Amino acid sequence: MDQITITFPDGKTREYPRGTTGLDIAKGISPSLAKRTVVMALNGTLTDLADPIDDNASIDFVARDDARALELIRHDCAHVLAEAVQSLWPGTQVTIGPTIENGFYYDFFRNEPFTPEDFAAIEKKMREIIARDKPFTKEVWTRDEAKKVFADNGEAFKVELVDAIPEDQTIKIYKQGEWFDLCRGPHMTSTGKIGTAFKLMKVAGAYWRGDSNNPMLTRIYGTAFAKQDDLDAYLHQIEEAEKRDHRKLGRELDLFHFQEEGPGVVFWHAKGWSLFQSLVGYMRRRLAGDYDEVNAPQILDKVLWETSGHWEWYRENMFAAQSAGDDAEDKRWFALKPMNCPGHVQIFKHGLKSYRDLPLRLAEFGVVHRYEPSGAMHGLMRVRGFTQDDAHVFCTEAQLAEECIKINDLILSTYSDFGFEGELTVKLSTRPEKRVGTDEMWDHAERVMATVLSEIKAKGGNRIKTEINPGEGAFYGPKFEYVLRDAIGRDWQCGTTQVDFNLPERFGAFYIDADGAKKAPVMVHRAICGSMERFTGILIEHYAGNFPLWLAPVQVVVTTITSEGDDYAKKVLAALRKAGLRADIDLRNEKINFKVREHSLAKVPALLVVGKKEAESHSVSVRRLGSDGQKVMPTDEAIAALVDEATPPDVKRMRGAA
């Protein structure tokens, strides 16, 4: 019998008969290894343990507590969910049930939609199915056989899915006891390996294949983990996230609102606009001296977007309009800009550029508009009109590494200043199959960025985690993505550094090199916050509305115990505002405890309480948000302390360096 060579994680090899399964190999090594293994990684790809191995391969046995098994726990749980539903409600049709971030879902077709009240019964049935510990077994059916079986079972959606499978692919059926489903796999060895650390989370409506012309399905979302402690931690995070929801806090703190007449665009209230402007002001200070701030038009002729490629590749996401009026010669199509980059190339092209002018760094807080389906919009996190803290660096190839390092340092220090001191991930996405530019250009850019990534890791120490995403770069160049972690452990992708070989050449942008030749610059797209609206939403949730003093829309409120302190309170207010603090006053004839509670709910960081005694001693009673105590201080001393605390971190650094 033919032999194959299997390579193990320690580099050792062993010969086996062709067709040996992963389970056979595991049993031959150790019965305990076979017992704890749920799937194998064959040449790095998770594969059913019972699959025969026909060629030389590397193998790694994956146990249930391995991080790689988590997706399978969730995938298998989705299958158990589907079996439970069909067991409880015969006649329900199952459609698709993929894993998603933090869980899974399954879409069902039933005349009466499911509700959260059904979850208890479904979860009970799921636990019964898991306890039976039925093995997952794979069968390969012919296309006609699969269609006939599903049609006979009244599973019209499955018949459609079989038809959609390419002719060169096999039809795989996975069974768990008597129940079976169409699935690509892989799966763990049995339902018992799923465990009981799962929970159904919510229901939603979803059109079949995402098309509103198709039937409406009921989507049941769930989550599953290897351990109960992990599930409990996740559920706590969800509970905490609901408390911190920026949409809820936006209403409670009077920051912003949305309404039907302006879907996906923000109505900023005074306090919210103050927060937004604090963010913009910070970014402006960080750019001063290194970047030229510019402003490109918001609406431009479609000719420009045709040249950039957006009209061909991004048209469905753009807002376009034809010019008004009856003049036929003036009838032109325009589009609101979805991105700032084409406008910045026009500014670069205006006037001859020499290599001595590079790097040229152009920054803009540009308002862009992109179409998002109404169902995809989510508060500040996903809107149709937003502001980008966009910048584009035009440089030579030799300058690329230094510019990427400078951008990285700016991004990391910015996140630290805003309180994101936890783990941060920097991902390098490399060339996709379809791309512009020569292999030599990509080789150079990827070498540079890989070197930069190593330097980022070395400088960042334990705080920085780095990853490489092969084939995930844009068609016009490799990129870095920055993923920060918030106060409750959620990850947010915000910053990007994107190399672009394409756009300068499309627009014929060039500089004169040292030898007098025209040369296209390397263009680096850079964003730190990304969408300023989204970053504001992240800040709201990160701080749960309890902003540090330098960011708080209202930093301090002066309030009185009785009307005897009104005149003195007004003098204190004037002194606070003269010192540059965002201050307000509360002279209402209400009990002081009522006022304190109200301003605490409004998350005002500092209250200065004054009465007759404070007026006579030129002092204030300082109450801080989250503290039950108070401290009596001379007014000048209290104001000086607040001014120091309200000084933005970047300004403090500049003063310290002066």
Curated annotation (Swiss-Prot):
Where does it live in the cell?
Cytoplasm
| Top-rank EC class of the record's enzyme | ligase
One GO CC term, this protein = cytosol
EC number, UniProt record = 6.1.1.3
According to its UniProt entry, one GO biological process term is: threonyl-tRNA aminoacylation
Region named Catalytic: 245-548
Which Pfam families does the record associate with it? HGTP_anticodon (PF03129), TGS (PF02824), tRNA-synt_2b (PF00587), tRNA_SAD (PF07973)
Q: Subunit notes for this chain?
A: Homodimer.
Q: Which family does it belong to?
A: Belongs to the class-II aminoacyl-tRNA synthetase family.
Q: What is this protein called?
A: Threonine--tRNA ligase
Q: What organism does this protein naturally occur in?
A: Rhodopseudomonas palustris (strain ATCC BAA-98 / CGA009)
Q: Gene of origin? A: thrS
